[in-house]
Amino acid sequence: MKKQPQKTLLAIALSVVSGTAMSHGYVSAVENGVAEARVTLCKFAASTGEKNTNCGAIQYEPQSVEGPDGFPASGPRDGKIASAESALANALDEQTADRWVKRPIQAGAQNFEWTFTANHVTKDWKYYITKPDWNPNQPLARASFDLTPFCVVDGGMVQPPKRVSHTCNVPEREGYQVILAVWDVGDTAASFYNVIDVKFDGDGPALPDWQQGGQIIPTMNLNVGDTVFTRVFDLAGENPAYTTELAIDSDALTVANNWSHALAVKINQTQSEIAAGQLNEQNQFVPVYGTNPIFLKSGSNLQRVEIGYKIETPAPEYDVTLSGLASEYQIGDAPVTLDLGLQATGDITTELTIYNHHKEPLAFETVAMTDGENKAVSMTLSKSEAGHHMLVTKVLDKDGTLQKQQTSDFMLTETQTPPPSDDYDFVFPDGLSSYTADTKVLASDGAIYQCKPFPYSGYCVQWTPTATQYQPGTGSHWQMAWDKL
């Protein structure tokens, strides 16, 4: 068997790769197309300003809805027809009656326009339409469509121009329908699939007294305290008299689709010359949980509607979390040192000052920190004497304005040689329930304390780790229960 030269193999490989990579396109309405594809409206707004939202990554590459060849015998699986099984386009497979912008159409001769970002040899284009009784709230499947294309255009196995238009005879339908346009590339095993969401309006406009002037697009979630409102413009400019405001006063309303629906409902309740929602079969404006078109009454002199927001900006929070401070430090040969940890909330400067009970400053540190930062601080006291001490922590913002101050108490105690065990009955709080009048205990400060006689002896047993007011030597009311020996 004769081997093919390596150079020839490389050339064949490159031609296959380039054929797939270079051929891209989408259904447009730039010149004379009747309607844009679903994916096209993810990137480009329609002439009415309407646009599809929450499309995912495909909004940046509408030309790339490419999938396996051979629909309907093969090609994309049911439920994946709109995305052509492309991971970029998964969102396009969502299918409900109110999910996508619908473009008006009528039965009869209509132009379908393709825009190619890279044209390529073409086998043909085919156009399919949903059955009259299809269910718009189920994923698109072969059963949704009349599988006999209503229009087939031969590509002649040549490159088309960068923009091409096909005149097709669209069948009679009513209401919301989906047209599937398939571009079969001639020299690859791939095709491009574009679904077009359309609405049949009969022989004339369904509501001649109304025209679209904007839309409510649920572009973002809001917060409680925010407000979303309409900005209505007439021939003279913005007219506040027509404004509709919706206060976001519950967690439910913070969700984008929910406030879009609620604002549309409020417009319909409060305005006579403005309506919002998608038009149903009874020519009624029905607010939906998604994009809601806004319509203006003819003769009202109103020109357009925009959406505005009042965003509540929460006041910045400044704080510091202090860790590592003990309730008691023993005085030894070296000066007492406090090893502390700080964690910042907000961009702050923390000032730390240690005072003794006589309000003498013994140590000071200033620490600049950014939001979320952790820092370790060591503070060595200038003198170490037994007794009550205080750590004062001040939190300043970037302008040096005091935002918070807190005081933490701690004790310094002399290091003592423990007395002989026969000088006391218990090491406090061991044996707590046995304490009676004259019971002697060794306290945490190294001193021995004796429980007072009745009626004060009852205080000696009143202690828990969180209720220490009668703790001998250190509690706030220890002298009511104990005598120091």
Curated annotation (Swiss-Prot):
Record keywords: Chitin-binding, Secreted, Signal
Signal peptide: 1-29
Chief place of localization: secreted
UniProt cross-references to CDD domains, sorted A to Z: LPMO_AA10
Disulphide-bridged cysteine pairs: none
Any one Pfam family match given in the protein's UniProt record, by short name: LPMO_10
Domain Chitin-binding type-3: 437-478
Gene Ontology cellular-component annotations: extracellular region
An annotated Gene Ontology molecular function: chitin binding
Occurrences of domain Chitin-binding type-4 (ranges): 30-200
Compartmental location: Secreted
HAMAP family with a match to the protein in the record: GbpA
Family label: Belongs to the GbpA family.
Function: Probably interacts with GlcNAc residues. May promote attachment to both epithelial cell surfaces and chitin.
Name listed for the protein in its UniProt record: GlcNAc-binding protein A
Organism: Vibrio vulnificus (strain CMCP6)
Gene name, Swiss-Prot/TrEMBL: gbpA
